[in-house]
Each structure stands twice: as C-alpha cells, then as structure tokens.
Amino acid sequence: MKIRPVILCGGAGTRLWPNTKKHQAKQFIDFGNWTLLGKTLERVKASIFDAPIISTNAKYLRQVKQHLKKHKIRKFKIVLEPAKRNTAPAILSTALIEDIPNEQPLMFLAADHLIEKVGLFNKAIKKNQKKLTHNNIFIFGIKPTMPSSEFGYFLTKNIKVTKFIEKPKQA
C-alpha cells in the first residue's frame, strides 16, 4: 500500500527573516524558480506515495491551490485548520479524516523543509516502509544535538517515541 503524504503547511514560517513577511511564510517564498512548498510537492510525486493531503489554514489556501496547480497535482485533499495550534493538533485533525483506510500509512512532512538528496530520502522511506504496521509509527529526521526554541523534537527510548516536545522555551 502506498504512503499517504500529509504536508503541514499552516505555520507562520517566520524563521527566514528578513525574507518572510506577515503575508508570506517561508514555504511560499520564491527563490528564483522554486519554493519550499514546491520542492515538497515534487518529492511526494514519487511512486511510493498516494495523493497528498495538505493541512493549512484559510490564509494560505489560495497559495496552496496555486502551488498544486503549478506542480500538476490533480488528486489531493486539503484540510483547513480551524485555528493555528502548533504541530500536534494539525497531525491529529488530519489523521482523523474518515476516508483514509486504517491500514494506510501516513507520512507527515513539513512544507518548509529543504531536502536536497531526494534519492536518499526516498530510499530511507522504502527501506522502512516494509517495517510499518498498524501498530507503529516511522519517523526520521535530523537528530537534535541540544534543545532549541526553534524546533520541536521527539524523545526516544529503545527505538520507541516516548514524548514529543513542541518548540521548548529558551532557558
């Protein structure tokens, strides 16, 4: 079964100052001929993925639809977040969509991450896709070296996630 990518695209995306503005989050900034959301949409065109779900808010809806059209993604679902409440509620609201089969794996991706080695990205997904069951979750990313108020992160024990820390406050 193909993985259903869920692109989290509702955040303010302000950590690329001075390029970000109130009306334009970093996932929508035009870097000449590409945007971070555009790169994310291109990544999920790989054969291992099903039609994407984009979790966003009403403020970004027009820009999301423009990107879907530009990248020729015709089959998709958009989930509008009722209020901006961080990552976990966006994941939960998307995971509760009724027409997603229970056995279909979901992969949550940030709209504003730059992944340059797409081949390695897809290889890591394929390798771990075989290990997925309805009882587990596969996550991967850059291992944090210290707590940061810029990023949320997972705590693990014996390859199991024990807790998610949402962008901790600076000490």
Where do the PLM segments sit?
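Conserved N-terminal catalytic core of the sugar/cofactor nucleotidyltransferase
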Residues: M1-I7, R15-P18, W34-F108, L114-E116, ...
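Conserved core of the sugar-phosphate nucleotidyltransferase
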Residues: V118-A171
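Conserved beta-strand scaffold positions in the cores of enzyme catalytic domains, especially
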Residues: F28, I78-V79, I137-I139
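Active-site beta-to-alpha loop of glycosyltransferases that engages the nucleotide-sugar donor
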Residues: G11
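Amphipathic alpha-helical segments in well-structured domains
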Residues: A25, N33-W34, L61, F121-K126
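A structure-centric signal for secondary-structure junctions around beta-strands
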Residues: K2-I3, A25, E103, S148-F151
